[in-house]
Amino acid sequence: MDTVHRDKDQVVILKKANYLPYLVNLFIPKLFYPEKIVVARLYLDVNKHDKQAAENFEGTETPCFDVPPSLFADKVPMDKIVFLPTSMLPMGFEAGGVFGPGILTRRSYPIDLKAAGHKGQTPPLFVGLRMEVQPPTRVESLLKKDGESQPIQDTLMNWLHASNDLINGAQPKGQELRDEFSLSMVFNLPIPPSPPSPYSYGRIPLQCNIYTPDLSNVLLLMSHQRDLTVAILSTVNNPHVPSVAFATMGDDAECPKFELPIGVFPICEGVNRPIFLPKRFMPKGFEAGCVIKPGTLSELWFMDYIGRFGPPQPQYNGSITPPLFVGKICREEPAVDMIKKIQFEIEKKASDDAESKATLAGVKPKFDISITKGFMVMETKEPKSPKGAYSVQNYDEAFDDGCIVRVVKKPATAEEATETRERNEMCTVGDQSQELDKCSTEADQKYLSCFHVDSDIDNIAMAMARLGIADMSLHADEEELCGIDGDNALIQLRHVLEDRNQIRSHTDQLMQDHIFRMNRDRMLALRQPFTCFGCGIHEKKQ
C-alpha cells in the first residue's frame, strides 16, 4: 500500500451529496496501522443519510486526502467519494470519506468486508485517515530505548504512595492553586458478595456511546473543599449500568442539574453532553452531579486542568481519555470524615480476609438458595394444560415447585347457583342415576396447571381470561413474606396482567421520545460553534 501524506490545508468543496452519514458514534478500535488508513463497512439501516446535514454543509470546505489506489483490487471511481466534515467524522480521524451504496463494484469491494452470499448493490464504505499512529503498548515498549519509559511497577507504587500521602493529610501544592474546582480521588467501597443467580446473564459489551455508572457506593476523597469537585472514574471499577441510563431519561426533577464553568469545561452537546445522574446513583454528600463519558475531553484539557495530580484509574480502553465525574457539594448536610470511614472499611476488609483464609468460605451465602421452578398454580376444569404451563397432580406438588400464587375461579353468585341447581334437576329427571353420577363427577373434577416464573405473561393472562372471573391468593406465611404487603402485591400483579399492553405502549413511547431528543441535540450540535483550545476563539464547524 502506498504511504499517505496529507497537508493540513488540503481541503475540498462539499457538493450536493446523496449519501452523507453522521459517523461520530462509529467506534473503530485504535490499533497500529502503518499507513494510518482505516476501511470500514457501513450499514444503511444504522448509518442513514443525514439530509439536513447535507443541506447545511453543502458548499463548505471539508478535509480530504489522496486515497491510495492499491487499497482496492480493481479500478475505483475516486471522484465518487464524498469527504465528510470534521464534525461528522469518527473520533480520532483527521479526514475521511464514504463511497455510497452501489458506487463500488463487486470486484473492487474489499473481500473481507463483504458478507458471504450478499445480493444487490454493494454496501457503503468508509475510508478514513487517522490523526496519529498509536501502536500497542507492547510494540511501543520494544521500539523505545531502555530507560525512556517508566516501568508499570513504578507507576503503581507512585499511585500507592500518592494515595497514602493524601490519606495522611499531605496536600499537593498544585491542587491548592486551583479555585474553580477541587480534584478528588475515587475510593470504591467493598461490595458484599452477591448470592449466585439461577439465571445466566450475559456480559455487557464495552461501548462508548453512553456511560452512566452507579456511584452510590463510591467515596470521593479531596484534600480541600470547593463548590465543585472533579474525579477521574474507572470503566473497570465503575462500569456502565443500563438501569442508570434508563433512569436518566425521566423527569428533570429526578436529575438535578447545574451549570458547568464555561471557562473550564468546553461546550459539549449532542452525544457528548454531560449526563446528570439521579440522586440515588450519586455519591454521598452531593446535591447534583454529572458524568462525562470517555473520549469526550481532549488530552490537552487533562494536561491543563488535572496534570500529573490526577490519580490513575484502570480503564478498558487506554487509547482515549478517561471519564469524569463533576459534582456539586451539598453544604446543608453535615461533613463526613471520609478518611476514618475509608480506614474502617480497609480494616474490616482485612479482618474478613484473615478469617476466610483465602478460601471460598468467606463468600458462601448464609442461606441456601433454591432455584424456583414454579410461580403460579391455576385450577381449571379442562384436562389439557394451558399454553406455556405444565400439569401437576395436587397442590402439594405445586407448592414444592415454588408456586406462591393460587388462581381459582371465583365462586358463583346466587343467580348462577340457581341456574346450576336447575341444570342438576334436569339431569335427575327419569331417575337416571348413572347420568346424575356423571354430571356430579364432571362438575367436581378439577385439574391443576403451573406456570414458570419466566413464563410468557400473555399466556398467563389468556389462561386467566378463560376462567372468567379469577380469584388470586398468596400461599405464604407472614414470616415468609418478610414485611411485604401481600394484598398490594396481588393488586399490582392483576394490574400488570390486565394493562400489559398499555404498559408496553407507554415504555415504547418513552423510548421514542428519547430517540427524538437525541436526534434533536445532535442536529443542534452540528450548527453550534466550538471553542478552540489554543486561542479560545469560536470557530465554525466544517
Swiss-Prot record:
It comes from the Eukaryota. SMART domains: DM7. Changing I262K: In strain: ZW106 and ZW133. Keywords: Repeat. The keyword Repeat applies. The keyword Repeat applies. InterPro entries: DM7. Belongs to the DM7 family. This is DM7 family protein CG15333. It comes from Drosophila melanogaster (Fruit fly). The lineage of its organism: Eukaryota, Metazoa, Ecdysozoa, Arthropoda, Hexapoda.
